[in-house]
Amino acid sequence: MRIAVLGGTGSFGKAMAGRFAELGEYDIVIGSRDAERAQATADELGGGRVSGATNEDAVRGSDLVVLAVKADAALDTARGVAGALGTTPVLSVATAIEFAKGVGMLPDPDARSLAERTADVVAGPVIAGLHSIAAANLDEAAPDEDTLVCGDDAAAKELVLELAGKLVAGRALDAGPLASARALEGMTAVIVNLNRRYKAHAGIRISGLPDG
């Protein structure tokens, strides 16, 4: 399986690509506007099955594309690769958080999620997830937390659930349709505020669910 990580030179994208690379099961392509920078990041992660390319070249032939760029660049990046992307599934991990007096919040709580807006500009299914995981946690090992995934396409969501489950020590849980991304992105703002207040890298755990 080939996974393209757009924004793979950033903190979260690089950490995610590194964790997938450590599993040794996937071909990882770091995508960036700057191919040389992407390749430098790939080399830093150990090379081998990790390579670097422009965003457009990274998505070609990939089985999953992770949109890990900053929130304010996500839609433009998605538009820029839409032609090369075709109907390949996209995993949206970004949240548009703004800070006012040190408190993080969504710019417009009543607006559609970034994941939903991404679905407007690409032909393939968009899945949202992994919002609550801190890059610092992925840098070290599988964090002791759960992660939530949502989307409307069953096959694409199952693929992301399988992959996400390999990144955390807890569980990757199906949180419903893509519309649930509004809640997931909002919850991320709360987690960011908690981590800033307590100087931590906390995640979430969902209790009371049956095993399996």
Give names to the regions the model predicted.
Residues 49, 55-89, 98:
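Rossmann-like NAD(P)-binding element
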Residues 94-134:
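Rossmann-fold NAD(P)-binding glycine/threonine-rich loop
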